[in-house]
């Protein structure tokens, strides 16, 4: 009995931990839903429209895009796909006539590139797997393809749902649940006068966990203010620096000559790359050489050597204080020479975001994950102006200022109140500085007169008393 109780407790703890890991408190309903709509039956299977909808408010899927996989329940094959393709055909040797598109029991599907012939396209396809965040671009948060499945069931009762769904977006981090049959999707005809519906529909829900995606954070935060000369940098090794130092083409440390082109390698896999993160000095010849911005097939970053070793740094500067308002400056810097960020997003949590007056160079959208609690907002770039964060270098930064109206019941510059509680970049939480390092408010001037003036006044009073 005691053993059974312990086993049950362990199971409940495991389930609780797995749910908690994939839960984002600033986007509690965020997920990616994959929906299969069977739109017609074929002699040996069915044709399904597969739609992937990103319901995450501020996390997108960047290049090289998504990869969706699953395991067939029986011996199904993919006869054809429109709007996507399987990465491997597999062993189709038993087919004598028409050859299927894929015979793999565990196919992996990727989006097509833009510009493919029209007869290979379908609505919401062919974007190289790039999917926007729902809060930033709802129209771009959907991706779709059509698949013809053979050697499968041909009725609602004989179709076996695929299992073991996986989603890479583009790297790890997503966990998908089982396929669940739901009420059939209803469609409106173009003239909106007739309704049709799918023959069968099932959905799969995938949630993201930053802990599964990377051992280390992928961004860090630094602070400064007008009322204190202290600049609080990102924490040392905020994104991982390894435990056995740097290795590679020279140490690049204190004895390295500026501009000698030496590089270092972070053996700790900072920024989520376990194979070691190479870095180069910002003033080295290599940083200015042709090809330094060329991405690698494995996605390994090339970072500028810093104490924090993060691909992204977010700097929050408390800039000005007015009678009824105060102003903060936000600057985002890219330290990765091999990656730019299209349609980047920045999320900040701060109590005064409930009274934003103006954002000067970014788009701003309040996020209300808990109804009327308005302390979280999303910043993103202006289209064709700064919605692209360039690679590391002189143009690898974007910045804006935020003007907020004071609420005198809560406003203060003391004890770090003016700095954000949390910062997210592209959906990943950034490493904050330790609270005891925040720029402090200098002591106020004494209310009474200076000591020298008080002493002089006391001496004069004594003289007057003696004279009297």
UniProtKB/Swiss-Prot annotation:
Residues 444-468 form a propeptide. Expressed mainly in developing sclerenchyma cells and in vascular bundles. Its main location: membrane. It is a lipid-anchor; GPI-anchor. A lipid is attached at residue 443 (GPI-anchor amidated asparagine). InterPro entries: COB_C (IPR056900), COBRA_pln (IPR006918). Residues 251-278 are annotated as: Disordered. It is found in: Cell membrane. Glycans are attached at residues 31, 156, 164, 228, 340, 355, 374. Keywords: Cell membrane, Glycoprotein, GPI-anchor, Lipoprotein, Membrane, Signal. Belongs to the COBRA family. This is COBRA-like protein 5. The gene is BC1.
């Amino acid at each position: 009995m005691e053993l059974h109780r312990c086993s049950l407790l362990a199971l409940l703890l495991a389930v609780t931990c797995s749910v908690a890991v994939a839960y984002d408190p600033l986007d509690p309903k965020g997920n990616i839903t994959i929906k299969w709509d069977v739109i017609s039956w074929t002699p040996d299977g069915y044709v399904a429209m597969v739609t992937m909808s990103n319901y995450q408010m501020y996390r997108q899927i960047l290049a090289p895009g998504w990869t969706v996989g699953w395991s067939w329940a029986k011996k199904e094959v993919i006869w054809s796909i429109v709007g996507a393709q399987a990465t491997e055909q597999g062993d189709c040797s038993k087919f004598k006539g028409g050859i299927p598109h894929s015979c793999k029991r565990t196919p992996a599907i990727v989006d097509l590139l833009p510009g493919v012939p029209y007869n290979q396209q379908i609505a919401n396809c062919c974007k190289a797997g790039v999917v926007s965040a729902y809060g930033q671009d709802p129209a771009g948060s959907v991706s779709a393809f059509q698949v013809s499945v053979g050697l499968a069931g041909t009725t609602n009762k004989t179709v076996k749902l695929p299992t073991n769904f996986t989603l890479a977006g583009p790297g790890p981090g997503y966990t998908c649940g089982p396929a669940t049959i739901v009420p059939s999707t209803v469609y409106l005809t173009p003239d909106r006068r007739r309704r049709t519906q799918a023959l069968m529909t099932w959905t799969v829900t995938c949630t993201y966990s930053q802990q599964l995606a990377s051992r280390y954070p992928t961004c860090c935060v630094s602070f400064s203010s007008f009322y204190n000369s202290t600049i609080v940098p990102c924490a040392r090794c905020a994104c991982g620096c390894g435990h056995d130092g740097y290795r590679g083409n020279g140490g690049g440390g204190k004895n390295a000559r500026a501009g000698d082109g030496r590089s270092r390698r972070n053996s700790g896999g900072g920024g989520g790359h376990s194979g070691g993160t190479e870095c180069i000095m910002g003033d080295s010849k290599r940083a200015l050489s042709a090809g330094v911005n060329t991405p690698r097939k494995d996605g390994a970053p090339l970072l500028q050597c810093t104490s924090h070793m993060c691909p992204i740094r977010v700097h929050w500067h408390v800039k000005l204080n007015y009678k009824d308002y105060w102003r903060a400056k936000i600057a985002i810097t890219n330290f990765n020479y091999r990656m730019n960020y299209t349609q980047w997003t920045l999320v900040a949590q701060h109590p005064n975001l409930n009274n934003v007056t103006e954002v000067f160079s970014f788009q701003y959208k309040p996020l209300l994950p808990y109804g009327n609690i308005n302390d979280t907002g999303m910043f993103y770039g202006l289209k064709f102006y700064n919605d692209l964060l360039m690679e590391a270098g002189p143009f690898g930064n974007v910045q804006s200022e935020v003007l907020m109206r004071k609420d005198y019941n809560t406003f203060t510059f003391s004890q770090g109140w003016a700095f954000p509680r949390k910062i997210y970049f592209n959906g990943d939480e950034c490493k904050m500085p330790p609270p005891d390092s925040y720029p402090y408010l200098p002591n106020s001037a004494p209310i009474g007169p200076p000591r020298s003036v008080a002493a002089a006044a006391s001496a004069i009073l004594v003289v007057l008393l003696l004279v009297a």
